[in-house]
């Protein structure tokens, strides 16, 4: 199905024919954003959705593959929310993890934090550098 069937505002700048299967297979051409993205933006689903709505694909959908965890995860999350009315975390928990008795989470509530391994940030000069992705490097 076309993404714009569930997300009408998405149907602009060459994205009218992007299918959900393109997103799921990382071949949508949306492996990042041209607009600047700050770390705190990733936690604002409405801002991320608006960035996707304005973004032009970096390649013709279905012709190449490109992966960027933060962009693809948020894109899938917005589609799931538009279809199911649930966040990606709630959808996964209710529809997959709980029925299959899987201890796997997308997002955690505070009660689960003691179970999480400590993560140490890599040394880098600018935290926003993680969002730098050049389309020419994806060829």
What positions do the PLM features span?
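Short, glycine/proline-biased beta-turn/loop segments that scaffold the active-site neighborhood
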Residues: 2-13, 99
């Amino acid at each position: 199905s076309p993404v714009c069937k569930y997300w009408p505002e998405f149907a602009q700048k060459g994205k009218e024919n992007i299918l959900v299967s393109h997103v799921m297979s990382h071949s949508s051409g949306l492996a990042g954003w041209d607009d600047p993205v700050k770390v705190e933006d990733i936690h604002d689903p409405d801002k991320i959705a608006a960035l996707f709505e304005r973004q032009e694909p970096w390649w013709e959908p279905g012709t190449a593959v490109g992966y960027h965890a933060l962009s693809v995860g948020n894109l899938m999350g917005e589609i799931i929310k538009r279809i199911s009315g649930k966040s990606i975390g709630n959808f996964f928990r209710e529809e997959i993890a709980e029925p299959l008795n899987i201890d796997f989470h997308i997002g955690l509530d505070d009660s689960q934090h003691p179970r999480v391994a400590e993560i140490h940030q890599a040394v880098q000069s600018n935290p926003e550098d993680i969002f730098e992705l050049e389309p020419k490097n994806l060829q």
